[in-house]
From Swiss-Prot:
Organism: Pseudomonas syringae pv. tomato (strain ATCC BAA-871 / DC3000)
GO cellular component: cytoplasm
Highest taxon of the lineage: Bacteria
Record-level Gene Ontology MF annotations: 23S rRNA (guanine(1835)-N(2))-methyltransferase activity; nucleic acid binding
Compartments, record wording: Cytoplasm
Record EC number: 2.1.1.174
Catalytic activity: guanosine(1835) in 23S rRNA + S-adenosyl-L-methionine = N(2)-methylguanosine(1835) in 23S rRNA + S-adenosyl-L-homocysteine + H(+)
Keyword Heme recorded: no
EC class name: transferase
The protein's name in its UniProt record: Ribosomal RNA large subunit methyltransferase G
Originating gene: rlmG
Top-level taxonomy: Bacteria, Pseudomonadati, Pseudomonadota, Gammaproteobacteria, Pseudomonadales
Length: 374
C-alpha cells in the first residue's frame, strides 16, 4: 500500500477491520489536501487541534508530533484504526486522546479539521457541540471527496459556524473553510424518537443511529421472527443500533441474558438508554466493539443480526461476512444465528459455507429471514 506523505510525516496506514489483500487504502486525496492546507497555513506545537471523523487516523497520526491533537469519532473501528496506526508508525498507541462522539468536547480549539461523514445528522450534532469550544481566531476546515460532498454539508457549516468558502477541487477532493462568527446558542434536535406498535415501545435515537426517524424495513421484517421460549439463553444483538431487536426479544424472554454490541458509540448510547427505559435495571452487557471480536468462543446460544452493507461510503458484504464468522465462533454447537438480508445478497449461500444448517424462516418481496445453526 502507498504511504501517506505530507509535510508532517510519512505514514504506513492500514484500514480496520484488517482484510487480506485489502483493495482500499486508509486515506484519500481529501486527507492529503487538508494536511497540505494546514502545513501551508502553519501550525504550532501548542495549537489545540480537534479532528472529527478521521477514518483510520490519517489526519491525527500525521499531526500528532506537531500539535496538541484530540480526535473524536463515532466509530469504534476508526478509533481502533488510529491507535493501531499510531503504534505502527513509531508512536504511543494513546498519543492522541480519543473522544467518542457520544461524549462532550472540551475546548477551546485553535483548529477543527472535519471529514464530512456519510450521515449529516452526525455532522450537525458535532457542529452544535462546537458551540463555545472555539478559541479566538479558530480555523474550521472540512474536507471530502467531491462525489461525497452534498451542498447541505456547507449549509450546516454556515448555519452553526459561520460563512463558508469552498476551495477549488484538487484530485477530486474539496475543502470547505468556515469562518466562526458569534451566534446564539442552538439547541440540538437530537436525539429523536419514534414509537412501535408491536412491541408497544418508544425508541430514542442519537444523531448517527441508522434509520433514526423510524424502524428500518429489514428490522421490521425480522421482529416477528425472533425466537421465543429461550429460557436462560445467552443472546447477542450484533450491530444492535438502538437496541430494538434485543429489547423486543428480552420483553418476550424474561430469563434470557443479553449482550448488545455496535461499532457506533451513539448506537450503544441509544441502546443503553432504550434498555433502561423499557427493562429497568435488568442485567445486560452493552459495548462499542468490533462486533463479537472479543466475545469468548462458545459463549452464546443465539445471535440476532441485521448486518450492514456499507462502511461510510464503501459498499460491500465484507462487514456482514465478518459478522457471520464472529457469530459462528461465539455460538455454542447447536446455537443459532438469525439474520435478515436483501434477497439479492445471497446470504443463504454464504451462511451455508459456515454453518451446518441454514433455513429460511420467512420472506417478504425484498427480504429473507434466515436461521443458521452451528
Amino acid at each position: 500500500m502507498p504511504l501517506l506523505i505530507s509535510r508532517f510525516a510519512e505514514l504506513d496506514l492500514i484500514r480496520q477491520p484488517e482484510q487480506q489483500d485489502e483493495p482500499l487504502q486508509a486515506f484519500d486525496a481529501a486527507d492529503e489536501y487538508l494536511l497540505s492546507h494546514v502545513a501551508e497555513t502553519g501550525l504550532s506545537l501548542d495549537s489545540r487541534v480537534l479532528v472529527l471523523n478521521d477514518s483510520f487516523g490519517a489526519l491525527a497520526a500525521s499531526l500528532a508530533r506537531h500539535a496538541n491533537v484530540v480526535s473524536s469519532t463515532d466509530s469504534f473501528l476508526a478509533a481502533q484504526g488510529l491507535e493501531k496506526n499510531l503504534a505502527r508508525n513509531g508512536m504511543a498507541y494513546d498519543a492522541v486522546p480519543l473522544i467518542p462522539a457520544s461524549e462532550p468536547l472540551s475546548g477551546p480549539f485553535d483548529w477543527v479539521l472535519i471529514r464530512i461523514p456519510k450521515t449529516l445528522a452526525l455532522l450537525e450534532e458535532q457542529l452544535i457541540r462546537l458551540q463555545g469550544q472555539l478559541a479566538p481566531g479558530a480555523r474550521v476546515v472540512a474536507a471530502a471527496m467531491v462525489k461525497h460532498l452534498p451542498r447541505s454539508a456547507g449549509d450546516l457549516l454556515e448555519e452553526y459556524v459561520g460563512p463558508v468558502q469552498a476551495s477549488l477541487a484538487v484530485k477530486k477532493a474539496r475543502l470547505l473553510f468556515a469562518t466562526p462568527r458569534p451566534q446564539e446558542v442552538r439547541t440540538s434536535p437530537y436525539p429523536t424518537r419514534y414509537t412501535l406498535d408491536e412491541p408497544a415501545i418508544e425508541l430514542l435515537n442519537h444523531a448517527n443511529v441508522f434509520c433514526r426517524d423510524g424502524l428500518d424495513i429489514g428490522t421490521r421484517a425480522l421482529l416477528p421472527c425472533l425466537p421465543k421460549n429461550l429460557g436462560a439463553a445467552r443472546v447477542a444483538d450484533l450491530g444492535c443500533g438502538n437496541g430494538v431487536l434485543a429489547i423486543a426479544s428480552a420483553l418476550e424472554n424474561p430469563d434470557a441474558h443479553y449482550t448488545l454490541v455496535d461499532e457506533s458509540y451513539m448506537a450503544v448510547q441509544s441502546a443503553t438508554e432504550n434498555w433502561r427505559a423499557h427493562l429497568g435495571e435488568r442485567d445486560v452487557v452493552l459495548r462499542a466493539a468490533d462486533g463479537l471480536d472479543t466475545q469468548q468462543p462458545d459463549s452464546l446460544d443465539v445471535v440476532l443480526c441485521n448486518p450492514p452493507f456499507h462502511q461510510q461510503q464503501v459498499v460491500g458484504d465484507f462487514l456482514a461476512w465478518r459478522m457471520f464468522l464472529q457469530a459462528r465462533a461465539a455460538l455454542v454447537t447447536g446455537g443459532a444465528l438469525y439474520i435478515v438480508g436483501n434477497r439479492h445478497l445471497g446470504y443463504h449461500t454464504k451462511l451455508s459455507r459456515l454453518f451446518r444448517g441454514v433455513e429460511q424462516v420467512a420472506a417478504t418481496p425484498k427480504f429473507v429471514i434466515l436461521k443458521a445453526r452451528k
